[in-house]
Every structure is written in C-alpha cells, then in structure tokens.
C-alpha cells in the first residue's frame, strides 16, 4: 500500500477507469470547464474500484457531435499540469494510453502527446511564474486607487 492508501494495482485500475470515463465524457461531446484533479471526487464503490464524479460543472458544456472541435484537449492539459506526489510520469502515460484506447500508437496520437507535453510545460511555467511573483501576503494588501 502506498502513501495514498492504494496498492499499485488499485492505483493503476483507478487511472484506467478515470481515463475511460474522461474519454466517454469527451466522446459524448462534453468538455469540462475546469477539469483539474481537485474537481474530481473519487469514492470507493462496493467492489474493488473507484467511482469518479466531476464537480464544478458551471462551465461544462456539451457540443453537437457534428461540430468539429478540440476543446477536449484543454481538459487533458488541465489534468496533466498539476504535479501530484503519488502520480508519476509513467502513471500519466498509462492514463494517456488508456484514454486513446486501441488507437494509442497512431501518428495523430503521437502528435497529440507531443502537443500535450508542450502545452503542459508552458502552462506549468506560467503558473509557477505567478506563484513566484505574488506572495499570499502581497495578495492580501489592499490596493488603494
């Protein structure tokens, strides 16, 4: 059992299940407004697995299937950008592989993976720059105008 209370098998099964659920969500035309780990509630089901619930859905939208769009890619960046102590790079790759399913090794998905890595690194750098420039104490100072 790891620091998060899950065995390696449980963690891998949970990542597989979450990837499948996110894929189904996207296949149905939904794009979450803020799909970050803190907006995913995980609860143990009656068996071995976990059930996942997406929270903070005020900006979640469903788009018609005939409308070509790539907004779902933003959800992958949102999920990937937060460093999580118990989620390794290999875990992230397992998630991506399961998300892509049988089409994992296609050229389009290899391009998507490179795009995702670039976007994630850029977004993390932007967030780190904000954190470095602005301390909590400074944020709390009232700015008179």
Which residue ranges define each predicted feature?
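Short loop/turn and capping residues at structural boundaries
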Residues: 36-37, 41, 110
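C-lobe/activation-segment region of protein kinase-like
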Residues: 50-119
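Activation segment
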Residues: 34, 44, 61-63
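Conserved NTP-binding catalytic cores of kinases and kinase-like/nucleotidyltransferase enzymes
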Residues: 121-145
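Conserved kinase catalytic-core helix
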Residues: 1-33, 38
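Conserved protein kinase catalytic/activation segment
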Residues: 39-54
């Amino acid at each position: 059992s790891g620091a998060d209370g899950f065995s390696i098998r449980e963690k891998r099964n949970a990542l597989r299940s979450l990837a499948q659920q996110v894929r189904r969500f996207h296949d149905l035309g939904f794009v979450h407004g803020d799909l970050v780990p803190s907006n995913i509630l995980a609860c143990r089901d009656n068996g071995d697995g976990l059930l996942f619930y997406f929270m903070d859905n005020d900006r979640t939208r469903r788009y018609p299937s005939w409308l070509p769009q790539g907004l779902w890619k933003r959800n992958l960046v949102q999920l990937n950008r937060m460093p999580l102590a118990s989620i390794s790079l290999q875990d992230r790759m397992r998630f991506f592989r399961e998300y892509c399913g049988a089409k994992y090794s296609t050229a389009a998905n290899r391009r998507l993976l490179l795009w995702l890595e670039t976007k994630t690194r850029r977004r993390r750098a932007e967030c780190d720059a904000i954190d470095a420039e602005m301390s909590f104490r400074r944020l709390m100072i009232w700015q008179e105008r």
